[in-house]
Amino acid sequence: CDAFLEGHFLLSSGRHSSAYCQMAYLQQYPDKCAEAMKSVADQLRDMEIDVIVGPAMGGIVYAYELARQLGKRAIFTERVDNVMTLKRFAIQPGERCLIAEDVVTTGISSLETKRVIEEAGGVCLGIACVVDRTKADAPSPIDILASAVKLDLPNYLPEECPICREGKLPLVHLGSRKMKEEAKQTL
């Protein structure tokens, strides 16, 4: 489905990479999206989960599809004034919540959703994702419990990016998160 792109990309984490997984391309094919999430759901069937929580934008479709396959409730968090919130839904105290993401590189974005879950009184069990691109020496701060695929793709701090040093490819930001110019430079 052409979701794997090569070039010079600014990731949501602020890191740079020569590879980008444009998961919106997968979402345009419901059968392929369902197939990817089936492999994730199969890894989670014995878990006690009450709610699947998808951070907007990337996690919404995957949370819905995972919840559908597991017979669970699906909700999403979204940004209000650049702060992740639970605007349209509620989590009951003690509900066991699983975060559904499209791609996890550093897990930092998922921390925002974990905070929302815990502030609502829920219990964050971990993350399920389509693509796990975390590094062994830099694991996600939240356990990744299931993924459809694990990819070992390079990513760099901006000041260590060899693509920037080479100066041949422009830096492209394809993600949904609006990043301030100064944040792009310091992350």
Segment roles from a protein language model:
Residues 1-187:
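PRPP-associated nucleotide enzymes
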